[in-house]
């Protein structure tokens, strides 16, 4: 049994596929999967890989996806490509694919990897093989049953929660993205087995849901919790409402597992955001949730100033590991884009915090009133546990030779699309391109990087065949382990 007792260090498993950063939504689109590669490269160079198990996720199958999504919708996602869009014009309109959710090369494979990591993490938690599972490629909370929305196509969160519900009577979903987690709330709006808690920007109108009065319906009444925030909320104000609300939710609902969506568009300076949180303020949410010592699935989400997304998710990985990391960034493949300060942490802006103490207290009291309406810990009639979505002893789904797979390091260096770094084009001169003062240090760091290249290559996530017994053969990579998870 992997669960840690008390407040000790947790066992953490982390899901990453080196191909994830290759997918490209298109020129000018704010969603950039490359941010996940930047995050991975940064946490590798901080040495965090030594402290957790790293797994390459399986590609989720259409069968797995249709446990929530409609057959027609998933069939459409499997079929649509940039070169055959004209044949699917009616379906594109029907399924809301085309503008915010464009068709791009490898769209379905991208969805498979995003979903595969989240579902595999849920399976690990169910099997009590880890305390926390991390999939920064997941957290795509806007996708609906038969519709793409808000840059999201397949709702990996809903699918992961459905997996957790096989073993857990009650699952708590917490969303700290600036945009409302509408797709997840909608999926579980009429059940008491999942409580959804989401902070929402009142001004950033997309997706237009998440009102304080949206509390669930039927059996799910009072099991949806939304707290709308005004522009400019800072670390102090956010902490004053997040901790007491989550503590009250834990007291009343008593979940046995938690899913935390860590959308980073609530950070100060985000291209699409209007909040003023620092990386530390954002990560405080992870710290608060960790204190309850429940199985925890941590997922990505929004975040459109990608260098800050990489900072945030790297730091939150360290928080999950109870690991202190220095503010000075280590040299990495994307070092120049963290200028001009080359630091891990960011400073808040001087924007006005429109969340007055009176407003915050009013919101908090309204939420407490709703939570008091909850019966304590609703019971669930226990049934036979369904089969896990992912089998440990299943074979390689694509039959590829893992030894011939290009390394993540080589892939990182090969992919260099200038468009991926357009998140700061409105910041004027200076900005992150001012690297002159760091050339000497960077040169020295490059030498050190070359010396440890062999060691870092060992941290590249590889597929490997599983031995016939269920224990599986693992490769010694100084703490980084890889596992091939494939179709049931």
UniProtKB/Swiss-Prot annotation:
Gene3D superfamilies on file: Histone deacetylase domain
Cofactor: Zn(2+)
GO biological process, one term: heterochromatin formation
Biased composition (Acidic residues): 418-428
Chain segments carrying region Disordered: 389-488
Catalytic reaction(s) noted: N(6)-acetyl-L-lysyl-[histone] + H2O = L-lysyl-[histone] + acetate; N(6)-acetyl-L-lysyl-[protein] + H2O = L-lysyl-[protein] + acetate; N(6)-(2E)-butenoyl-L-lysyl-[protein] + H2O = (2E)-2-butenoate + L-lysyl-[protein]; N(6)-(2-hydroxyisobutanoyl)-L-lysyl-[protein] + H2O = 2-hydroxy-2-methylpropanoate + L-lysyl-[protein]
Compositionally biased intervals (Basic and acidic residues): 402-417, 429-481
Record-stated family: Belongs to the histone deacetylase family. HD type 1 subfamily.
Function: Histone deacetylase that catalyzes the deacetylation of lysine residues on the N-terminal part of the core histones (H2A, H2B, H3 and H4). Histone deacetylation gives a tag for epigenetic repression and plays an important role in transcriptional regulation, cell cycle progression and developmental events. Histone deacetylases act via the formation of large multiprotein complexes. Also deacetylates non-histone proteins.
Name listed for the protein in its UniProt record: Histone deacetylase 2
Source organism of this protein record: Gallus gallus
Name of the coding gene: HDAC2
